[in-house]
């Protein structure tokens, strides 16, 4: 027990514990809701009829544990992964998360399994990097409380659903960590990846700018790298616009 307790106090152990707690809690609540609600699946977007039939007519375990996650934005992301932006309404969703889902499809994964695998792996990575950043900036006790605050946040289930939030937060926290180490081009690339995950990634240029100004005497010696990092999120947004329209 002492060994387990010591392991859970390490960054990855704490991150894994937080992730598993969130994953088990949300899966349990989703399964309970699916079992008690007569109409347990609602699809609010164009969907894959074959995939929907598999979920509706599958085993009880499939209906309770998998089907509740095939709804809302997940449906759109899977559609983009399968068909690209043939449906122009889907252009409001940037392409990086669907591209990673498509990678899972190329490996033979079920579409919903691929979507959940990407988001859940990103959630675990986000918890790990968040713990490390909080521990570095403050201490281990506050890092653990930070993970707890994320897990009990009312919309934390977004992190383990087939949504892009966990991937976005993974890139965002990695961007901030790189900026704190004054690795400007890496921070800019991570901000660009966040922008290709969610449009809000464009605003990661603000903490990059602030961090550079806050440490200006050192930043001045890396001025080209800093300016290049600042430009990358905007270039990513421009590239996405060109990709969609041309």
For each feature predicted by the language model, list its residue ranges.
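Start-transfer (signal-anchor) and selected internal transmembrane alpha helices
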Residues: 1-57, 228-229
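Membrane-interface junctions at the ends of membrane-embedded or membrane-associated helices
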Residues: 2-7, 136-137, 180-187, 211-224
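Short hydrophobic/aromatic helix or loop-helix immediately within or flanking a transmembrane segment
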Residues: 68-109
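Transmembrane-helix signature of polytopic, membrane-embedded enzymes
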Residues: 113-114, 130-152, 170
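Short acidic/glycine- and proline-prone juxtamembrane loop motifs at membrane-interface regions
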Residues: 161-167
